[in-house]
Amino acid sequence: MKNDKLFLTGKILEIIHGDKYRVMLENNVEVDAHLAGKMKMKRTKILPGDVVEVEFSPYDLKLGRITQRK
């Protein structure tokens, strides 16, 4: 279960509120994503236009977790 995660690259379209973002993935699908815990702890700033890596659970492909800014 823990190793069944999907990783895709996307571009931040807008900040919804707080740590929630709207992301356009490389396959032209728009999803919502939130910051991973380590990124919150390090207070990483994410702005519209940034390219990020998004992690998905195979059970819910509409909500992702931003794990890295590229």
Curated annotation (Swiss-Prot):
Disulphide bond pairs: none
CDD domains reported in the protein's UniProt record: S1_IF1
Annotated GO MF terms: ribosome binding; rRNA binding; translation initiation factor activity
Keyword rRNA-binding appears in the UniProt entry: yes
Record bears the keyword Transferase: no
Keywords: Cytoplasm, Initiation factor, Protein biosynthesis, RNA-binding, rRNA-binding
Matches recorded under InterPro entries: NA-bd_OB-fold, RNA-binding_domain_S1_IF1, TIF_IF1
One GO cellular component, as annotated: cytosol
Main location: cytoplasm
Superkingdom field: Bacteria
Subcellular location: Cytoplasm
SUPFAM superfamilies per UniProt: Nucleic acid-binding proteins
Role: One of the essential components for the initiation of protein synthesis. Stabilizes the binding of IF-2 and IF-3 on the 30S subunit to which N-formylmethionyl-tRNA(fMet) subsequently binds. Helps modulate mRNA selection, yielding the 30S pre-initiation complex (PIC). Upon addition of the 50S ribosomal subunit IF-1, IF-2 and IF-3 are released leaving the mature 70S translation initiation complex.
Stored NCBIfam families: infA
Subunit structure: Component of the 30S ribosomal translation pre-initiation complex which assembles on the 30S ribosome in the order IF-2 and IF-3, IF-1 and N-formylmethionyl-tRNA(fMet); mRNA recruitment can occur at any time during PIC assembly.
Record protein name field: Translation initiation factor IF-1
Species the sequence originates in: Mycoplasma genitalium (strain ATCC 33530 / DSM 19775 / NCTC 10195 / G37)
